[in-house]
Regions:
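Internal active-site segments that recognize and position negatively charged phosphoryl groups
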Residues: 149-184
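Short beta-strand/loop segments at the ligand-binding rim of alpha/beta enzyme cores
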Residues: 12-27, 87-99, 158-170, 219-237
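Alpha/beta catalytic cores of nucleotide-metabolism and tRNA/nucleoside-modifying enzymes
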Residues: 1-6, 213-233, 239-286
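C-terminal helical cap(s) of enzyme catalytic domains, especially alpha/beta-barrels
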Residues: 59-70, 133-134, 201-212, 262-286
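Active-site beta->alpha loop and helix N-cap motifs at the rims of alpha/beta catalytic domains
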Residues: 35, 42, 46, 63-150, ...
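Catalytic cores of alpha/beta
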Residues: 33-42, 104-113, 174-184, 237-254
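N-terminal amphipathic alpha-helix/helix-capping segment at the start of soluble metabolic enzymes
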Residues: 1-29, 37-41, 82-91, 284-286
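Glycine-rich phosphate-binding active-site loops on the catalytic face of alpha/beta enzymes
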Residues: 46-58, 117-133, 186-202, 251-275
């Protein structure tokens, strides 16, 4: 089979049309081909792939990708090529979330490999230094070792300016968000308000929905100051259900949302658990 390719120009034109029409842009993470196929059929605009999504699809928490137990970029490239691309019809574009701090990779070659398989969008969240608390000892150690947000900004700029790819920035803090938008000028920027709550592997603490909307809107305002044309989407924290996303749309000035666990891990857990339990509860009538 041959999956239809979507050019960068077509992706950007489609995004502009939705922004102009005030239609929410939806980005969805997928850790398996089945989930990606279902998301595309449902109408998502972008399927993003990253090692955390693949780990989630196998029952681990997203944060497993933060430990040096796998080659994050190789995991992402392999399952994107083998599981995701063959499952799609070409309606949704694919964004590969990459680790720009990989010391064993020339990111030009990684980005070129993405393009060769038909992926014309890249993000810095695979994982990102922005995950790590800047007051922590591990952040200081990482910085001294050259593992920095600077490399992520460089990759996003290179993807957009040199590789003609759609660049999708993501940050967890106002400081990182401003830097990424101001220096990398990504086509799309996602403010990550924190780990998604709920489910078997979800985070039980975090912000309320109202707090999520407030901090997201604050980030949007700061990002627009340095990059007025950026497309802004929300993600994380209390954004778990469709009604939560609706609240974010109604109470922020962004252009859409990015779903992760909300449209893959959580519905899979719920549906499979119920179906399996219904079968497991069967008994002989005689």
């Amino acid at each position: 089979m041959i999956t239809k390719r979507i050019s960068t120009e077509t992706i950007l034109a489609n995004l502009k049309r939705k922004v102009d029409a005030r239609e929410p842009i939806m980005i969805s993470s997928a850790g398996s081909g089945l989930v990606a196929k279902l998301q595309e059929a449902a109408g998502t605009d972008c399927i993003n792939t990253f090692s955390g999504a693949r780990l989630r699809a196998n029952g681990m928490g997203t944060m497993s990708m933060m430990w040096p137990i796998l080659d994050s970029n190789r995991q992402t490239l392999n399952y994107t090529r083998e599981d995701i691309m063959p499952a799609l019809d070409g309606k949704a574009f694919v964004c590969a979330c990459l680790n720009a701090n990989d010391p064993l990779k020339d990111m030009h070659m990684v980005l070129q490999e993405c393009k060769d398989m038909g992926v014309n969008a890249a993000s810095n969240i695979g994982p990102s230094v922005s995950y790590v608390d800047k007051d922590s000892e591990i952040f200081k150690v990482m910085s001294s070792a050259g593992i920095t947000i600077d490399n992520e900004i460089e990759m996003l700029k290179y993807a957009r300016e040199e590789m003609n790819m759609v660049s999708v920035g993501l940050g967890f803090t106002l400081e990182d968000s401003i830097r990424i938008c101001g220096e990398a000028k990504p086509h799309i920027f996602c403010f990550h308000a924190g780990t998604t709550q709920g489910g078997l592997k979800g985070y039980s603490g975090g912000m309320t929905l109202e707090e999520t909307a407030a901090v997201t809107e604050e980030a949007y305002a700061k990002c627009r100051e340095v990059h007025p044309d950026v497309i802004l989407v929300a993600h994380g924290a209390a954004l778990e259900k469709p009604e939560d996303a609706q609240y974010i749309l109604d109470n922020t000035s962004g252009h859409g949302f990015w779903t992760g666990s909300s449209t893959e891990r959580l519905p899979v857990e719920q549906a499979v658990s119920k179906a399996a339990k219904d079968f497991a509860d069967l008994r002989f009538s005689k």
